[in-house]
Amino acid sequence: MVLNENDKEFVKKLFDSLDKDNNGKLTREEIKEGFFKLRIPSSEKDIESFLTNVDKDKDGSVSFKEFEDFTIENIKKLKIVFEELDTNKSGTLDIHEIEESIKKLNIPLYSEQELIRLFHRIDKNRDNQIDFNEWRELLVLLPNSNLQLIISFWKDSQILDAGFDNGGFIPPMVEKKEKASSLRNTITYMLAGSVAGFASRTSTAPLERVKIMCQLNHGKPISLISAFKACYKDGGIKGFFRGNLANIIKVSPESAVKFGTYEYVKKLFAENDCELTSAQRFISGSVAGVVSHTTLFPLEVVRLRLSAEIAGTYNGIFDCFKKIAISEKSIRPFYRGLGASITATIPHSGVNMMVYEFLKHKVIKMTGNEFPTAGQLLVCASTSSVCGQLVGYPFHVVKSRLITQGSSVNQEKYTGLFDGLTKIIKKEGPIGLYKGIVPSFMKSIPSHSITFIVYEGFKKAFDVNLKEKKHH
């Protein structure tokens, strides 16, 4: 393979940059310092290995001729590897070609963010294409130029961006540190979920109240304007926020449990996030939804009762708990509708998380950015919210009626989920199962958008993705 003048000029400039005293020879110290700056492993063992391969006359230093022979031979090998990776023969490598090569070599990647960091490690001018000059600059001094070693070094060399340990790679974390990091990440997920839940529910509380009023209406569907007027008449501005405190008390820990569980279940399927299938994301989302919803379901009952009843029926959360318990002399009313709720949560939460993550990862790959923008997250969250609601909404309607049955706003009696579905369809038609879905969309789309934007923002602020990438 013929080298061009550009390659020879590159070798001369590289040698001169390492030869600090300009005496035409590279000492062990100059090589070590140069490797350190180039972010190449530079432990004593690495330097010794380099000298063994390059210092042919064994005088303890590297002349320009020795350096030139070694690097030119490496450049020839690098060109062969580059052409092997360049499957579309464009003369450059794009992120999809790199991803396919990594998959073929079975080298693990934690996430799309790691793939993009890896790509940008070489793509210095950020044009989303790696030309041979960029490829050569990072890899020319590797002692071996086979594809497996190149990709592994390229991937692992990202660790050097965070610092060095005695001039070499940072050693692997011991198990205790990995566990501590995993615990910190779990706490971060839960904190992010909690704050996201608080922010989203408070900002959309009026729409939640209107949605519940529509769900509990047994007659002809009422218009949004009529529902808003009824809410305002029953308590003024405060009427729109009735039940919101119970909602916050419920949703903040519920969101914390949901996101913490979701990330945990994903890890059971695969250490690397980008290896997960859509089915595995669906299962992770469903399990997270069921665990979080079941854990705090009594608060869901109180929230719905506070939102549904007329002003003055209950004097706050604890009074609502007390009156519900006294009226039926058991804890059963606090779990009435749980079956319908779980039935609704499985497809709703599963589809929601599956679609959201699918779209988010697509955006990351398409844009080449490590993190989607707030606008892009809004589109992902909105789409996933609509998909989740379409499959789970009828069960939410039945759940709301099961929870509030026997109250002043819902005198109808249901024995369970199937009975509820049957009676609603019989008396109100199939449209009865979708009563309140318009205000539900109006509430859930901004609510989910706020939730995911805050959640992803927290993860980014605490650098969770990068931390996990280092430990996996």
Curated annotation (Swiss-Prot):
SUPFAM superfamilies assigned to the protein according to its UniProt record, in alphabetical order: EF-hand (SSF47473), Mitochondrial carrier (SSF103506)
Gene3D superfamilies: EF-hand, Mitochondrial carrier domain
Any GO CC annotation of this UniProt entry: mitochondrion
One GO MF term attached to the UniProt entry: calcium ion binding
Segments on the Mitochondrial intermembrane side according to the record's topology features: 1-189, 264-281, 352-377, 463-472
Topology in membrane: Multi-pass membrane protein
Residues holding Ca(2+) 4: 123, 125, 127, 129, 134
Stretches assigned to coiled coil: none
Residues that span the membrane, as ranges: 190-207, 243-263, 282-302, 331-351, 378-398, 442-462
Similarity annotation: Belongs to the mitochondrial carrier (TC 2.A.29) family.
Stated name of the protein: Mitochondrial substrate carrier family protein C
Gene of this entry: mcfC
